[in-house]
């Protein structure tokens, strides 16, 4: 989300921020790998919190001590990068990070935005609680309800549908052949 599209890194997220800013919202975001906070799944998720507030934020302070920083503790970032978001979402679409030659997004794992001003930083989690593995949450097979099991006569069809495929197909309208 923070990096797309490849041709204009960060543009899609900049459009979202521009729209929220245009409506008067202030925004916090965090990219969180749940395994870094003790959960058994290694998957990154982007949390976005937008608030309609008249309160003026100290962006650097909010980055380290805002709602998301309290929910997902972090080590104080070494440095903060500043980005400016165009007020008009159309301008963000056309101009954001274009022609800079940059192969990277200006948005990092944590950030805050108010009135088009963005403070963003690379962060490290500061979680010290218990950590779980998949083994901690797996249910004993004897306790799993019957409807979660695949019937033996449907197993081969299930494996085919869920498995990798390499089939020749033809588009009926154009006659174009492709591999599916």
Predicted regions and their residues:
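Class I S-adenosyl-L-methionine
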Residues: 1-180
């Amino acid at each position: 989300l923070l990096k797309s599209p490849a041709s204009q890194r960060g543009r899609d997220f900049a459009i979202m921020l521009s729209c929220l800013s245009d409506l008067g919202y202030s925004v916090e975001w965090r990219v969180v790998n749940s395994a870094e906070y003790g959960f058994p799944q290694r998957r990154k998720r982007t949390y976005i919190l937008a608030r309609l507030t008249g309160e003026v934020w100290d962006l650097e302070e909010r980055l380290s001590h805002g709602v998301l920083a309290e929910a997902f503790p972090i080590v104080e970032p070494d440095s903060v990068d500043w980005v400016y978001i165009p007020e008009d979402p159309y301008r963000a679409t056309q101009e954001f990070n274009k022609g800079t030659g940059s192969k990277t997004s200006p948005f990092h794992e944590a950030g805050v935005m108010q009135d088009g001003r963005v403070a963003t930083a690379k962060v490290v989690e500061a979680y010290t609680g218990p950590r779980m593995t998949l083994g901690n949450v797996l249910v004993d097979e004897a306790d799993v309800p019957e409807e979660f099991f695949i019937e033996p006569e449907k197993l081969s069809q299930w494996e085919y549908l869920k498995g990798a495929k390499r089939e020749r197909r033809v588009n009926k309208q154009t006659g174009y052949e492709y591999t599916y």
